[in-house]
């Protein structure tokens, strides 16, 4: 309870009227101190007792006409009153000090508990990050299967709050947490007992399930349908992706060595390797080298052409494969954008930008050849770019400048890649400032920028090109 001067006992109030100085002192002490006493009622009782006793003493003295000692007694009363009040206030202060110390200790303990909780959460998240980083490698070992299983099991034990804290050299919450589609719709094509004839379709790979099904499986299915007397099998060249899919989805995909060893174990005699790579780049060269190491294990080994065929050394000389891809890709992009023709898109002020990967390999001339082919076909509003900016004219900045100078105010981005995986979803259409979508928008030159996230592999016309390349290899 909080006491105010008006709540004092009547006798005390009357008594304190004997001198304004004493009255002011009393009320000042009460007004300043009594709110504190509200926290401790017993202290209030003590001071009330002292005040009452002193006031009664004074009245008694006055009634007995101790006039000569009045001034002396007044001084004693005031002194005793002040001493009593100060004593109680000190006691209260000590009590409050003890209480504050207790409160501070509780707050500190609470903070320590919260800190320990955060520390435990971060520790659990860091352990998972380390496990992810351990399988984010390009080399498979005898421990890889167990490491993939351990990483997923540890992730599943985390709370949602802990999962958000996962951050490593390569690890992040998206490694296990991002939904990329239904992996059960895919087929790793690693079955045994397949007969003597095998077509091994080799891809870089992607951890995006929907894209893997639409693009890579789409090509594999088309080749299998066209070659019923052959068994189509799969291999990925990116162990990082193989580990990711295995750890997250439990789907085991062979790497090149595993696939070739499996073919040998299955007694395959005739092997045709069909790369889904775009061009004769570094990855294609590595693939050929790996196959050559197994050439003595089979009666015949043949490697088919990648999608764009032979490279050549002249940027203005284009083969039939590049021409076909230019026509097929452009037609698909125009249709997806809702136009009846490329000319209709041009009249609308819309340009199409096809983004490839880019490479420092001599095969980078293929991108220049693709742009030359677009120009030869009269596709004035089609531009070729690359993530890596190699060749130089294909960098995002240079492509933005080219589209702006051509006068187009609307842009449609689409990957010039077999698979619409990480590059298409993040480098092209991502929300980060360095994505092509963001950079085109930030340039301020275009009224609209849209993205079509679809790989070449899902286009029927492109699948037929791969089928033709496989047939050519079989017929060699």
Model-predicted segments: where are they?
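Low-complexity, Pro/Thr/Ser/Glu-rich flexible segments characteristic
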Residues: 100-119
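Bacterial signal peptide processing site
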Residues: 95-97
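C-terminal motif of bacterial Sec signal peptides marking the signal peptidase cleavage site
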Residues: 89-93
């Amino acid at each position: 309870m909080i006491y105010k001067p008006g709540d004092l006992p009547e006798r005390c109030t009357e008594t304190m009227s004997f001198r304004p100085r004493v009255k002011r002192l009393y009320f000042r002490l009460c007004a300043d101190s009594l709110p504190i006493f509200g926290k401790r009622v017993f202290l209030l009782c003590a001071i009330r007792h002292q005040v009452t006793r002193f006031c009664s003493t004074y009245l008694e003295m006055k009634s007995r006409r101790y006039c000569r000692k009045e001034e002396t007694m007044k001084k004693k009363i005031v002194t005793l009153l002040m001493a009593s009040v100060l004593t109680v206030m000190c006691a209260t202060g000590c009590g409050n000090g003890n209480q504050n110390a207790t409160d501070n200790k509780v707050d500190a303990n609470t903070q320590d508990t919260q800190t320990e909780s955060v520390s435990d959460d971060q520790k659990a998240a860091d352990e998972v990050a380390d496990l992810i980083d351990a399988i984010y490698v390009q080399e498979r070992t005898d421990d890889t299967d167990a490491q993939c299983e351990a990483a997923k099991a540890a992730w599943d034990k985390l709370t949602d709050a802990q999962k958000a804290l996962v951050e490593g050299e390569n690890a992040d919450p998206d490694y296990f947490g991002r939904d990329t589609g239904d992996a059960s719709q895919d087929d790793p094509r690693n079955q045994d007992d397949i007969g003597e004839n095998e077509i091994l379709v080799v891809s870089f790979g992607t951890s995006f399930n929907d894209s893997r099904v639409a693009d890579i499986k789409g090509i594999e299915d088309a080749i299998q349908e066209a070659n019923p007397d052959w068994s189509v099998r799969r291999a990925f060249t990116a162990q990082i992706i193989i580990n990711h899919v295995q750890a997250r989805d439990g789907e085991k995909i062979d790497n090149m060595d595993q696939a070739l060893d499996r073919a040998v174990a299955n007694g395959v005699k005739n092997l045709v390797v069909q790369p889904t790579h775009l061009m004769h780049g570094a990855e294609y060269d590595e693939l050929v080298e790996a196959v050559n190491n197994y050439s003595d294990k089979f009666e015949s080994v043949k490697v088919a052409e990648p999608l764009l065929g032979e490279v050549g050394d002249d940027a203005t000389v284009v083969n039939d494969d590049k021409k076909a891809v230019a026509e097929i890709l452009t037609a698909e992009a125009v249709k997806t954008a809702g136009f009846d023709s490329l000319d209709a898109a041009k009249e609308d002020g819309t340009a199409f930008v096809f983004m490839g990967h880019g490479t420092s390999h001599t095969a980078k001339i293929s991108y220049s050849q693709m742009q030359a082919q677009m120009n030869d076909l009269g596709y004035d509003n089609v531009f070729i770019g690359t993530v890596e900016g190699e060749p130089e004219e294909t960098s995002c900045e240079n492509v933005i400048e080219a589209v702006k100078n051509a006068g187009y105010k609307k842009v449609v981005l689409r990957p010039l890649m077999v698979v619409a995986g990480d590059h298409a979803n993040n480098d092209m259409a991502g929300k980060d400032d360095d994505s092509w979508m963001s950079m085109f928008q930030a340039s301020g030159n275009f009224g609209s920028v849209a993205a079509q996230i679809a790989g070449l592999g899902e286009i029927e016309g492109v699948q037929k090109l791969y089928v033709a390349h496989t047939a050519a290899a079989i017929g060699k």
